[in-house]
Swiss-Prot record:
Alphabetical list of InterPro entries matching this protein: Aminoacid_DH-like_N_sf, NAD(P)-bd_dom_sf, THF_DH/CycHdrlase, THF_DH/CycHdrlase_cat_dom, THF_DH/CycHdrlase_CS, THF_DH/CycHdrlase_NAD-bd_dom
Pfam families (alphabetical): THF_DHG_CYH, THF_DHG_CYH_C
NCBIfam families cross-referenced by the UniProt entry: PRK10792.1, PRK14186.1, PRK14189.1
Binding site for NADP(+): 165-167, 190
S-adenosyl-L-methionine as UniProt keyword: no
Top-level division of the source organism's lineage: Bacteria
Protein name: Bifunctional protein FolD
Keyword terms: Amino-acid biosynthesis, Histidine biosynthesis, Hydrolase, Methionine biosynthesis, Multifunctional enzyme, NADP, One-carbon metabolism, Oxidoreductase, Purine biosynthesis
Length: 286
């Protein structure tokens, strides 16, 4: 059996068409959605991500601002800029690209963003709302994964789901969204004793560790859905995920490729969150 590919690019295209239509409707009423992107330093991967986010805004009718600062920017100056963006009525979403330089406290920066503009869903108020099942924003990558599972009609109610990774950005919110959908969820991580014992019983596996080949064919239940959130490079410098794709695709029922799987969905859900923020603001001021 060869797994069916979950095509993040195709699904992303469909969702972005909806985003563009909603953006056009808001703009026609004088409420163009706006996303502010802030980059501190010159991390090459961050530069690529930011460029893709700004381009996605332009391509789909959202306004965007891009602030780029040197790596030695004082924390106080970054916080002052966030305060300005919080008060700017043209901006509905604020994204500070992580990681930040070591002298800047990323928790302090995230908490400085107004919760209603925190389109990444990282603010403690939004994390708490997600925990209680009433999220204002769902974090973009887990939100994208849920959209993929829904689009391919992969059943979650009563399913055994394993999330490998416990980060605040992917692992923890991913587990909460799967739980909300009715799955029985296990979170595994670097201290998990026997990872394969958990994954072999899983109907759905989400790998989000940043470690190549953490999931191999012998660790996967036949027919399972395998979602690869990882972004790594192999020996030849080629982009790859956390999953041994060549092996696992012969066992799994569904699998996401890297690239072309989860990656495009992350930026798409950022656009969706920004649109939702703009729609809320427009409704409040109607």
């Amino acid at each position: 059996m060869t797994a069916k590919l979950i095509d993040g690019l195709a699904l992303s295209k469909t969702l972005r068409a909806d985003v563009a239509a909603r953006a056009a409707a808001l703009t026609a009423r004088g409420h163009q959605p706006g996303l502010a992107v802030v980059l501190v330093g010159d991390n090459p991967a961050s530069e690529v991500y930011v460029r893709n986010k700004v381009k996605a805004c332009h391509d789909n009718g959202l306004g965007s601002s891009f602030d780029r600062y040197p790596a030695d920017l004082p924390e106080a100056e970054l916080l002052a800029r966030i305060d300005e963006l919080n008060r700017d009525p043209r901006i509905h979403g604020i994204l500070v690209q992580l990681p930040l330089p070591p002298h800047i406290d990323s928790h302090k920066v995230i908490e400085a963003i107004a919760p209603e503009k925190d389109v990444d869903g990282f603010h403690v108020a939004n994390a708490g709302a997600l925990m209680t099942g009433q999220p204002l924003f769902r974090p973009c990558t887990p939100y994208g994964v849920m959209k993929m599972l829904a689009a391919y009609e992969i059943p979650l109610q009563g399913a055994n789901a394993v999330v490998i990774g416990r980060s605040n950005i992917v692992g923890k919110p991913m587990a909460l969204l799967l739980l909300e959908a009715g799955a029985t969820v296990t979170i595994c991580h670097s201290k998990t004793r026997d990872l394969a014992a958990h994954t072999r019983n899983a109907d759905v596996v989400v790998a989000a560790t940043g470690l190549r080949n953490i999931l191999t064919a012998d660790m996967v239940k036949p027919g399972a859905a395998v979602i690869d959130v990882g972004m790594n490079r192999d020996e030849a410098g080629k982009l790859c995920g956390d999953v041994d794709f060549a092996g696992v695709k012969e066992v799994a029922g569904y699998i996401t490729p890297v690239p072309g799987g989860v990656g495009p969905m992350t930026i798409t859900m950022l656009l969706v969150n920004t649109i939702e923020a703009a729609e809320r603001e427009a409704a409040a001021n109607a």
